[in-house]
Amino acid sequence: MTLLTEALSKICPVDAELMAQAQARLDNKTKPIGSLGRLEEFARRMVAITGSVAPDTKKKVVFTFAGDHGVTDEGVSAFPREVTPQMVYNFLRGGAGINVLARHVGAQVRVVDIGVDHDFGDTPGLIVRKVARGTRNFARGPAMTREEAVAALEVGIDLANEAKREGIALVGTGEMGIGNTTPSAAIIAAFSGLPVPAVTHRGTGIGDEALANKVRVIEAGLALNQPDPKDPIDVLAKVGGLEIAGIAGLILGCAANRLPVVVDGFISTAGALVACELNPHVRDYLFAAHQSVEVGHRVMLDRIGAAPILDLQLRLGEGTGGALAMGLIEAGVRILTEMATFEEAGVAEGDY
């Protein structure tokens, strides 16, 4: 049995009875029923995912996967490919947005080279799981072989298994890869069948002419490669990215290990979408961190049935929205575990 087939076989629905029990406890806290809104949702879902009446949230990790994209040859990004390794070094020095926000919520950042077109040597702190030096240009042929896509999925699964063994309590997804909104838009277009312009946006801030070119490139890639929406690995291999595959695998591994996973923005949700298409029960283990300004993100979230926690007009990626959302999920759990009941506080209950 391969890592992928094993993970897929272990993913099952969360326990609805546990969720109901958690809500009953929340309803007995010193507050009107339901008055803490989605914080209560986060708490009861954490109970159902972990199987614990007092879920642990102390050890939090954001995995930021880095990979390059051959489709950048088509002029789809405002930034050159060299920025990908430069940003990896920035992550490792602790100077990027994700580093700042992860520190703010007490999370660790782990940077994974899954497909950067650069030799990092023995760079301290970098997790090197390179499947290839970037994808190929999907406007000219498949981005990856099927074998490469599966290998990248299994990198993510392996990292999730390691996280479980370490006692990590809450996992976040992040990414870095110049041009990666292009494969992300291609993935949701392939699965949804929507016109490419309806799911494609400006990414790093490209202008109207570059956006029109980006749409044409995605349309050409889909027409050439004909990804099969009934075969998620085929979609991933033909128009996806290595970091997207790594994120999809991480999410599958987390679901298989009953680890809650906080999904960042557009690119991370492309990975979550692939994971959910492979096994629909995956969605039970996901928290959608935020609503990105990328137009295709809403389509992705609707398809996987996820309600975003935040809407802050974010479009950076890296795991930044996920880090922020971790703090709110942890707050919900603390309401469940630390807030007094009416009986404990000696407060009269309301008559509902």
UniProtKB/Swiss-Prot annotation:
Q: Which reaction does it catalyse?
A: 5,6-dimethylbenzimidazole + nicotinate beta-D-ribonucleotide = alpha-ribazole 5'-phosphate + nicotinate + H(+)
* Extent of the signal sequence: none
Question: What Enzyme Commission number(s) does the record list for this chain?
Answer: 2.4.2.21
Q: Which SUPFAM superfamilies match?
A: Nicotinate mononucleotide:5,6-dimethylbenzimidazole phosphoribosyltransferase (CobT)
Superkingdom, natural source = Bacteria
The record's InterPro entries line, in alphabetical order, gives: Nict_dMeBzImd_PRibTrfase (IPR003200), Nict_dMeBzImd_PRibTrfase_bact (IPR017846), Nict_dMeBzImd_PRibTrfase_N (IPR023195), Nict_dMeBzImd_PRibTrfase_sf (IPR036087)
Protein name (record): Nicotinate-nucleotide--dimethylbenzimidazole phosphoribosyltransferase
The GO biological-process annotations, alphabetized, read as: cobalamin biosynthetic process
Q: Gene3D superfamilies this protein is in?
A: 1.10.1610.10, 3.40.50.10210
Q: Provide the function of this protein.
A: Catalyzes the synthesis of alpha-ribazole-5'-phosphate from nicotinate mononucleotide (NAMN) and 5,6-dimethylbenzimidazole (DMB).
Listed GO MF terms: nicotinate-nucleotide-dimethylbenzimidazole phosphoribosyltransferase activity
Positions of the catalytic residues: E318 (proton acceptor)
Q: Name one Pfam family in it.
A: DBI_PRT
Keyword annotations of the record: Cobalamin biosynthesis, Glycosyltransferase, Transferase
Pathway(s) where this gene product acts: Nucleoside biosynthesis; alpha-ribazole biosynthesis; alpha-ribazole from 5,6-dimethylbenzimidazole: step 1/2
- Family as reported in the entry's similarity comment: Belongs to the CobT family.
